[in-house]
Every structure is written in structure tokens, then in C-alpha cells.
Amino acid sequence: MSPPQHVAGVCGSLRDASYTRIALDHALQAAEDCGAPTTLVDLRGYDLPVFDTDHREAGDAARLQEDIQRADSVLLGSPMYHGSYAAPLKNALDYCGFDEFENTTVGLLAVAGGSFPTMTLEHLRSVCRALNAWVLPHQAAIPTASEKFENG
């Protein structure tokens, strides 16, 4: 039997009481319950200046890349902002590339304060495909998140 797949959940929200982080914690706990080791890549803990191609190794870029490369599968989580995914996640993905995502299985999770976050998921799917990742056909979406979570 093959060893369990290591799953990294990348939280694209910087908010302290983030519904995205809560949802990722639940998803990662479910993976752990199935025997998979997990890592939460919480972007609040990384120094990632706005991406500049002249400074690809700025801040904690190397640590972010290593944390994602170490995983067999990646779950990207983002709140919906103006119909798309959050800038911190976009910035983190800009520091990554084929080395981190090519042939990696990627799951998508989006959280919205209002309507269904369809566009967020579609945008993330397009970015992951451009990185040659294997994006799961099923995705997780949580509309009206404040009504779904009570005390975590």
C-alpha cells in the first residue's frame, strides 16, 4: 500500500477570523482523519512583498515554494473578493510556478459573504491549469459563510 498523500492547504485570506481558514481547517482535519499528513500554509505567516519579476526570491518566497513542493496535493482556499480570488493568494501563486504545481493534484475551496463564489473557483481553476496542475473536477464553495459557521 502506498503511503498517505501529504496535503497542503493554502489560505488566501489574511483576516484573523477568516471563514476560509476555518473551512480549510475542517478540510485538512478530514484528510488527517483519513491518515494523510497535512500542513496549513497560512499566508499571514509569510513575508511576501508584491511580486516583482526582478526580485523573484524576495522575502519568504523560497519557504513558500518549499512548503508547497513538499505536498503531494494542494488545497487552495480563498474568499471571494469582487468576483475573484483574494490578492494575497494571487501574490503567493505569482511566486510559484511549474516546479510547485506541475502534475500536482489541486483542490479548490472558495468562501463568500454573499452569493455563490462561482467566479472565484473558475479563476483559480484557470490559473492552476496554466501551471499544469491536475485540478479536481469537484470543488467546495461556501456562500453566505457567516450563516454557515458558528464558533468555528
Q: What annotation goes with each model-predicted range?
A:
Residues 10, 107-109, 136, 140:
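Hydrophobic/aromatic beta-strand patches that form the interior of the parallel beta-sheet core
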